[in-house]
Amino acid sequence: MSVLGELDLLGPRAHGAACGEAVLKAVAEDFQVDEVLDIPLSGEGEHLWLWVEKRGLNTEEAARRLGRAAGVQQKNVSYAGLKDRQALTRQWFSLHLPGKADPDLGAAEGADLRILRRTRHSRKLQRGAHAANGFTLRLTGLRAERALLDARLERIAADGVPNYFGLQRFGHGGGNLVDARSCAEQDLLPANRNLRSRFLSAGRSYLFNRLLAERVAEGSWNRAAVGDLLAFTDSRSFFLAGEEECRDARLAALDLHPTGPLWGEGDPPSGAGVLDRELALAGSEPALCRWLAKAGMAHERRILRLPIQGLAWHYPEPDVLQLEFVLPAGCFATVVVREILDLVPTGQTENPCAY
């Protein structure tokens, strides 16, 4: 089986070649994620909400540990989104405990998991309920000219970056996509819910990235065209662009963006030449598109351009770049870094030069 690389799974950069190279995730603390949840919690109800810090632990395993410690079935443990294993992350979980007192969750805690806050609420935590994620990234072993880095960072702060799904979505070497294609060709859906979700997501994400890669290559990823479906940064609804909509000032302000397809049942509702492009993409991957539709996936949209909120940076040491920013839920910090630096595996940098 051939291994799929970054260009196979994502596409070209929008802002030119990387300014240099660095290491990300030399230790878990180098990649910190804080979930941003805009839900006022009532303090009472049959759902126990937990603000959890985890280190080197994926979300699904954390949920299993919390469920076992609470003595509840896994279906009664909820979380808003999946967070990286190789990171220090803080996110919410909820446990459905009707008529039960708060359980002792000490068995779930350890060096890799701490419960920082507990409160009650009347409803469970829904998937995708978080508004955003805040990131603090520490890039070490930096080899780059600082003036070039600063200019690139200013540019992406002003213009955003292509909103690719990151490599994490596709598994090691693109294995999740390989498995998705295999399922599609056999017209099968995995019985295991987590595997099914993982493979369907990989298939949809790949099709979206293919479309976005085409628009990055031609320079139209950040411009609206007649027939595009436009969406605001934090909205799942969209509307068709005509001539007037293409001149909307909110496009230049990075509040409104063209979108691409998250494939599902039926043809995309885009118009004019945009629809032709999206149907041509479907025609190049017919088995995958049929499989996604048959699985009952609804046709959705995702913004092509990723605005970066509150981007700040500094150099705590000559060979270290620290970044802080906020991204909408479902977007990948690694695609931001990709527009700045090449990432090299831990231990493969030479002694860095300080510029």
From Swiss-Prot:
Catalytic activity: uridine(13) in tRNA = pseudouridine(13) in tRNA
Species per Swiss-Prot/TrEMBL record: Pseudomonas aeruginosa (strain UCBPP-PA14)
GO CC annotations, alphabetized: cytosol
Catalytic activity, EC: 5.4.99.27
Presence of the UniProt keyword Translocase in the record: no
GO MF assignments: RNA binding; tRNA pseudouridine(13) synthase activity
Protein name: tRNA pseudouridine synthase D
First-tier enzyme category under EC: isomerase
Superkingdom: Bacteria
Alphabetized Gene3D superfamilies for the sequence: TruD, catalytic domain, TruD, insertion domain
